[in-house]
Amino acid sequence: STLLASSAASDVYKRQVYTKTLEYEDINYSVASAEDQTAIFGGWSSWLNYFDSSLPFQLSFVNRRSRSGSRYKVNISEADDRFNSVRTEYTGMLKNQIAKSNNGIERAKYVTFCIPAENVAAARPRLERVEADVIGNFKRLGVQSQPLDGRERLALLHGQLHPGSREPFRFKWADIAHTGMGTKDFIVPDSFDFRQSRSFRVGQTWGAASYLQIMASELSDKLLLEILELDAELTVTMHIQTVDQVKAIKTVKGKISDIDKMKVEEQRK
């Protein structure tokens, strides 16, 4: 699935892989002052540096068309006073404004990290430790985050596999024992069609996948924002595997050596 961590070095995956997914909120980077943007960028760099070479992770940005009954997150808690009716009315107004400004597109952000382990019992303590660290690091950035449980992850994948559909997600853990089916049976669409070379079909919806290779020496910090602001249902994923510093330096030196050889060969022509 798109929310499971991507494959990395084979030696990391000789054992089973266990994952966790967190949903996190946005940070107002684009409207911040230049000074605040610098601080946010530094904090984000520190957040990324937490993940070492043994902890691959994936960032997922999911844009989906809102359905009737879907709820935008507006956190205005009720209080023990006589103004709750005003709060309710104001919350409804904000949700309507958000829906209009987003053209009906709901935008969600996730981070999924994975660890190799012999079994669930061995994986759980480290997963929980990493989860606590990641949530704490988010909090230092002023970003709220929360883990998804198994059912919430299934619901998310169900939405990914039923784009444009109004089919509700129906699943309870007890259903597995009652039906004998696995979790995948509850989220799979009625059909897949991969006969086209540049597109595919999931149920009644057509889609396409693209791979972006960044070769530019400079990259605008607005690139991802501009992609995610497209008025379309789309998913952008970043598969990130930190490289050990010694190995990275060796790789860079090797690339420089290759470039020097190419220069010499060109000069001989």
Predicted regions and their residues:
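Extended, folded cores of ATP/NTP-driven motor/assembly subunits in large transport
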Residues: S1, S6-K269
